[in-house]
Swiss-Prot record:
Tissue: Expressed in all tissues with high expression in spleen, small intestine and peripheral blood leukocytes.
Protein name, as recorded: Suppressor of cytokine signaling 1
The gene coding this protein: SOCS1
Domains as described in the record: The ESS and SH2 domains are required for JAK phosphotyrosine binding. Further interaction with the KIR domain is necessary for signal and kinase inhibition. The SOCS box domain mediates the interaction with the Elongin BC complex, an adapter module in different E3 ubiquitin ligase complexes. The Elongin BC complex binding domain is also known as BC-box with the consensus [APST]-L-x(3)-C-x(3)-[AILV] and is part of the SOCS box.
Stretches the record annotates as Kinase inhibitory region (KIR): 55-66
Keyword Cytoplasm (UniProt): no
Length: 211
C-alpha cells in the first residue's frame, strides 16, 4: 500500500513539474473570418479559324443526300482511293492496262471527286463536277443523277473510255462477285422481284451496280 502511494506521488510530482504548453494560434484563425477566395475566370478559348476546304455549302437537302450516298457507295466499291494525289494516282496507273481507272478526292475547290484513268497516251485525271444535283465529267454534257451511273455509262460506251477499276484489294470477296453477276444478269431495276429473303435483297440493293 505504501509502495503504491509512493509511485502515485512520484507521478504527481513529475506531472506537476512539466510546464504546460499553450496551444499555438492557428494560422487560419483570426478575429474575423477570411473572405472566400474568388474563383479565377477560365481563360477565353479563341474560336478555331475556319480551315480551307473545297466542300461548299449544299444548295438543297437533295444535293446533300446525293453526295452522302455517293460517298457511302465509294467507300463500298473498293476502287475509291480517298485523298490520293494526282501524282500518286498516275504512278499507280502507269503500269496498268489502258482503261484502268480509279476515283479519288479532287484537289480543286469546286469539285468533290476526280476520275484518274490510264489512257493510250498515259494516265490522266478528269474532274467530276456536281451541278444542279447531277454529276458530269469535265468537258462533257452528259450528266447523271448518280456517280456510279456515270461510271457505268463510260464503261459500257462504244468507245469504252473506262475498263476495269483499280481496286485496293486485288482479290474480291465471293459475295461481291455474286452480287455483281446477279445485278448484271437481272438489272438493278428488277432486283426487288427476285424471290429472296430480306437480308439478301438488302445486300443486293446496297450496291446495285455492275462495276
Amino acid at each position: 500500500m505504501v509502495a503504491h502511494n509512493q509511485v502515485a506521488a512520484d507521478n504527481a510530482v513529475s506531472t506537476a513539474a512539466e510546464p504546460r504548453r499553450r496551444p499555438e494560434p492557428s494560422s487560419s484563425s483570426s478575429s474575423s473570418p477570411a473572405a472566400p477566395a474568388r474563383p479565377r475566370p477560365c481563360p477565353a478559348v479563341p474560336a478555331p479559324a475556319p480551315g480551307d476546304t473545297h466542300f461548299r455549302t449544299f444548295r438543297s437537302h437533295a444535293d446533300y443526300r446525293r453526295i452522302t450516298r455517293a460517298s457511302a457507295l465509294l467507300d463500298a466499291c473498293g476502287f475509291y482511293w480517298g485523298p490520293l494525289s494526282v501524282h500518286g494516282a498516275h504512278e499507280r496507273l502507269r503500269a496498268e492496262p489502258v482503261g484502268t481507272f480509279l476515283v479519288r478526292d479532287s484537289r480543286q475547290r469546286n469539285c468533290f471527286f476526280a476520275l484518274s484513268v490510264k489512257m493510250a497516251s498515259g494516265p490522266t485525271s478528269i474532274r467530276v463536277h456536281f451541278q444542279a444535283g447531277r454529276f458530269h465529267l469535265d468537258g462533257s454534257r452528259e450528266s447523271f443523277d448518280c456517280l456510279f451511273e456515270l461510271l457505268e455509262h463510260y464503261v459500257a460506251a462504244p468507245r469504252r473510255m473506262l475498263g476495269a477499276p483499280l481496286r485496293q484489294r486485288r482479290v474480291r470477296p465471293l459475295q461481291e462477285l455474286c452480287r455483281q453477276r446477279i445485278v448484271a444478269t437481272v438489272g438493278r431495276e428488277n432486283l426487288a422481284r427476285i424471290p429472296l429473303n430480306p437480308v439478301l435483297r438488302d445486300y443486293l440493293s446496297s450496291f446495285p451496280f455492275q462495276i
